[in-house]
Amino acid sequence: TIRKDILYLLMLKKIADKIKNYSGRPPVDELRKAAVLIAITDSDEPELIYTLRSNKVGSHGGEVSFPGGMYEEEDESLEDTALRESQEETGLDRSKVDILGPIDTVVSRYNISVTPFIGIVPKDISLNNQSEEIESCFKVPLSFLLRDERHRNDEINRDGDIFFMPAYQYDSFIIWGLTAMTVSYTHLTLPTKFVV
């Protein structure tokens, strides 16, 4: 049998190859724009980096999210937005992020066009909540997300259109809403025959 750490290294390579050739849903021009970073650790058991937003903030307080935020005029691109905001929120050194590319843009309930970027970071990358908006940073094993063990499915009614949104529970954290939907879209870019 192939060692587990070798399997994960092969998976990271497959993810990199697939993302670089992936043509996702582009940003919506007429909406305000934001970007988030889906950072995957380059380790024997890859993990995704999340933030828990502080209850002190009005928008998304107490919610789990990927690091990221709104596009600003000084940003060179949405990729730059994702990297800038991630560094501001988590202290993550943007120079150590190997961006593979974007996946499908999603539209939030506030009508913001959010583009996620997948990037590989060193397994021992330093994280600390740099912003008052962030209560803590934590990691979730990619293997947990690939198993798709949903805590529940939420029924959402948006202007008469009904759709279901997944929610995941990892330890005491609930991953739901736009962040959970982004995890589901990430599945589209991952190797379909990889078993964890």
Annotate the PLM regions.
Residues 186-192:
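Conserved small/polar residues in nucleotide/adenosyl-binding loops
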Residues 10-28:
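Entry/capping segment at the start of metal-dependent catalytic domains
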Residues 1-10:
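Short, Lys/Arg-enriched N-terminal segments with co-localized hydrophobic residues
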Residues 26-66:
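N-terminal strand-loop-strand
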Residues 56, 70-171, 175:
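Unchanged
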